[in-house]
Amino acid sequence: MTQKACCAAIDAHARELIELSKKIWERPEMGWTEKNASAWTADYLKKQGFAVERGAYGMPTAIRAVWGKGAPVVGFCGEYDCLPGLSQKVCPDFEPVVPSGLGHGCGHNLLGVGCVAACLGL
């Protein structure tokens, strides 16, 4: 697959990927408790044809999604947890949604969805 084809595969899902990222942003969850983000991500991958294992590796919110067989094997590690005290509206200035609340100040709502995009691109 060429770079152009990979990018086109991702672009074809851009709207859905952006919506997934926004959904995770709007419902921040601390590490090990990301039940919604995990479920939404797993559901999306399953809808795209991946074989999805929820609660992978003994972690309740971990996902293992498999596509195809054989070699090479490529793995991605996505994150979707948030941190306390980083609640933020979608704007460039500091404007918490909830003062001292949970938020995605480190962009994990983007990192997890970025890994989903990379999977789709391959």
Language model feature labels by segment:
Residues 2-104, 109, 113-116, 120-121:
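Acidic/His- and Gly-rich active-site-bordering loop/insert found
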